[in-house]
């Protein structure tokens, strides 16, 4: 089936209204893309990340009356006149197969792999997580997830108790369990994350408990991993302290490299010893130890 793509770049204030307008004129799908290849602005907890200049893309059947669609869009969103919309014809091909072909097994460290379900495992003797790429939650492709997975491979949590705080897809909890952790729990504020994490755990025969934050309970653990954003990482410091044993390890990621120094200083003020910083692209992962208080 052939498709027509209509796109334009708008401010963050217009991105959601334009998405709604696309759906009102019967777009088959609407997606957002970063128009400037910039880091995501950090949102408040519970809000959707969006870029200052966002490319909004609507997909339409090739039989659609595209000029009429654009005129309708211009009427619905007067701040975006008809001449600002770009039209692109997409070739007729198996888009599901094309999407699947983008993803190949990914290696983290020396023995940890994430393998899409339609791919063969490159190394059957390695630690292989069967995980399909998704639109909503991290499955290894983002630098912050990659940094945490590499850290786990290099520092296997053998016989340790672990919490994955802000679990998303559950990939970090899965990696910890498969790398020898004694007991692993995961939590997130998003119900869809809990569902996705549990499905991924079941697919990998992993015994992991996932709960919403408001329902989450745990004894203090040996290792806590939080791959979220810098603002929530600060706000959650008291909760992390409560959930960690003395001398436990804390792994923080989800922050931009230019936010690292401030977060390091903040956690040192909370009584943590800073151990190391690892960077990838514009993102960072930080390691701390919870110091014993006298």
UniProtKB/Swiss-Prot annotation:
Function text: Methylates ribosomal protein L11.
Species annotation: Hydrogenovibrio crunogenus (strain DSM 25203 / XCL-2) (Thiomicrospira crunogena)
Entry keywords, A to Z: Cytoplasm, Methyltransferase, S-adenosyl-L-methionine, Transferase
Family according to the record: Belongs to the methyltransferase superfamily. PrmA family.
Subcellular location, principal: cytoplasm
GO cellular component: cytosol
Subcellular compartments: Cytoplasm
Name of this chain's protein: Ribosomal protein L11 methyltransferase
InterPro entries: Ribosomal_L11_MeTrfase_PrmA (IPR050078), Ribosomal_PrmA_MeTrfase (IPR004498), SAM-dependent_MTases_sf (IPR029063)
Cytoplasm keyword on record: yes
UniProt catalytic activity: L-lysyl-[protein] + 3 S-adenosyl-L-methionine = N(6),N(6),N(6)-trimethyl-L-lysyl-[protein] + 3 S-adenosyl-L-homocysteine + 3 H(+)
Gene name for this UniProt entry: prmA
Annotated positions binding S-adenosyl-L-methionine: 145, 166, 188, 227
Source lineage: Bacteria, Pseudomonadati, Pseudomonadota, Gammaproteobacteria, Thiotrichales
GO biological process: methylation
Key word Cytoplasm present: yes
UniProt EC number: 2.1.1.-
Any one GO molecular-function label of the UniProt entry: protein-lysine N-methyltransferase activity
NCBIfam families, alphabetized: prmA
